[in-house]
Amino acid sequence: MENKETTTTTTTTNNGSDKKKRSLKIDLHTHILPKNWPNLKEKYGYGGWVSLDHHCSCKAKMMIDGKFFREIDSNCWDPDVRIQELNRDDVDIQVLSTVPVMFGYWAKPQDALDLAQYLNDHIAQVVSENPKRFIGLGSLPMQCTESSIQELRRCILELGLPGIQIGSNVNGKNLDDPSLFPIFEECEKLGAAVFIHPWEMVGKDRMPQYWLPWLVGMPAETCLAICSMIFGGVFQRLPNLKVCFAHGGGSFPFTIGRIEHGFNARPDLCAVVNPINPREYIGKFWVDSLVHDEEALKFLVNLMGEKKVTLGTDYPFPLGELVPGQLIESIKEFSETTKENLLGGNALEFLGLDPNKYL
């Protein structure tokens, strides 16, 4: 059944009259934190952890070992504020995941597991209180294979989350590292969706200024993650693994020609694990729509296919799309069916969820 038929809903105006039917709008890429959490330095006995300084009623400073990292607004922790903004922007559902700085891959595995459980329980609670507006993705202590599989099973089988968010590397280990494969294998077995967000960006020591880790490092880091999974045979060995990469797949879609040419020119260097041309994997994974440019998004949809790009805004952060779906909706060349796929249908397919649950 086509997404156009299964994701259409009727919205209602303030006076109760029905507006024109439209498809579900689902933002796959949003971040949330608890309003408070324990003092992790005291709890675990060492530093490096994030804390929140609620210095006024609607803002908080994210601090790492007493040093300022980022200021956030109440929409980063308050579901009621988020719902107000969802209604304002005609967004039906947000998919919630933690802020990547909370991954804790550098920490002792038992502590990273404890924090992941705390964050996952929080997301599951937010979803349970607003099940028509929120869907949750869990976090894993990826530095420990056994603990990750344990928490993955809890997320999917006990908390009812449809998937997880992970970083683009784990303490410098690329995503083809053998220690990570059993986690991906379990994800495929459980049907769990895997959203991959860049963090600990490659080359960040050379990017001390101009916000370059976010502007240049993140797209490069995501491309590195995709190539690692392709060349390292993860997609080859796990053909049913569901993966979506943030930020439109980073620089990968725009350098696939170079990647393919290198594979063909030097198979002795590129095809040492997986003999399949990397272009063959286009359309085998998803990317979000967060590219900030009309021509880039048209190229991305044409390359990946209209069923493999899904709305993602990076809400509530300023580098995201500030009006969710505005770019998709503004492109005249996209048919209504294409827009419906991009705005919601593709997210539901990636997550393995029945649209009727949200109508």
From Swiss-Prot:
Q: For bias kind Low complexity, which ranges apply?
A: 1-13
Q: Name one Pfam family in it.
A: Amidohydro_2
Catalysed reactions listed for this entry: 2-amino-3-carboxymuconate 6-semialdehyde + H(+) = 2-aminomuconate 6-semialdehyde + CO2
Name of the protein in its database record = 2-amino-3-carboxymuconate-6-semialdehyde decarboxylase
The Gene Ontology CC terms held by the record are:
cytoplasm; cytosol
Q: Output one GO BP term.
A: negative regulation of quinolinate biosynthetic process
GO molecular function term, any single one: metal ion binding
InterPro entries for this protein: ACMSD, Amidohydro-rel, Metal_Hydrolase
Q: Where does substrate bind?
A: 70
The EC number(s) this enzyme carries: 4.1.1.45
PANTHER family, A to Z: 2-AMINO-3-CARBOXYLMUCONATE-6-SEMIALDEHYDE DECARBOXYLASE (PTHR21240), 2-AMINO-3-CARBOXYMUCONATE-6-SEMIALDEHYDE DECARBOXYLASE (PTHR21240:SF27)
What family does the entry list? Answer: Belongs to the metallo-dependent hydrolases superfamily. ACMSD family.
| Described purpose of this protein according to its UniProt entry | Converts alpha-amino-beta-carboxymuconate-epsilon-semialdehyde (ACMS) to alpha-aminomuconate semialdehyde (AMS).
UniProt KW keywords? Decarboxylase, Lyase, Metal-binding, Zinc
- Protein origin, superkingdom: Eukaryota
Instruction: Describe which pathway this protein belongs to, using the record's wording.
Output: Secondary metabolite metabolism; quinolate metabolism
Q: How does it assemble?
A: Monomer.
Binding of Zn(2+) occurs at 29, 31, 197, 314
What species is this protein from?
A: Dictyostelium discoideum
Disordered: annotated span: 1-21
